[in-house]
């Protein structure tokens, strides 16, 4: 299975054990000013799903031997929507780094 199908399957099936397995031991997640480790990430995602988080519009941007990038819309419990862009750097066939940018879909971007 390729990287994209693996990640989509983990999200769609809420497979936390599979998530734990695919994250490299040196894994780090970076979002704005947040930096978390592998174990913290699994707990964080599990709690978010338990709180009602859902994913929509999963869209592949690029996949190659070193990275995977995609965009999605996250919907929080209560209906708050965020568009996220996710870039994963892979190491030893596992996710080594996640860099995520988030945009509030209720706010108008000024360019």
Describe each model-derived feature in a short phrase.
Residues 4-9:
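Amphipathic alpha-helical repeat scaffolds
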């Amino acid at each position: 299975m390729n990287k994209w199908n693996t990640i989509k399957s983990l999200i769609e099936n809420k497979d936390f054990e599979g998530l734990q397995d695919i994250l490299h031991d040196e894994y780090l997640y970076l979002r704005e000013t947040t930096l978390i480790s592998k174990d913290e990430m699994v707990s964080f995602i599990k709690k978010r799903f338990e709180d009602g988080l859902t994913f929509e519009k999963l869209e592949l941007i690029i996949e190659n031997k070193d990275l995977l990038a995609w965009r999605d819309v996250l919907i929080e419990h209560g209906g708050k929507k965020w568009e996220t862009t996710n870039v994963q750097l892979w190491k030893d066939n596992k996710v080594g780094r996640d860099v995520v940018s988030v945009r509030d879909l209720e706010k108008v971007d000024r360019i």
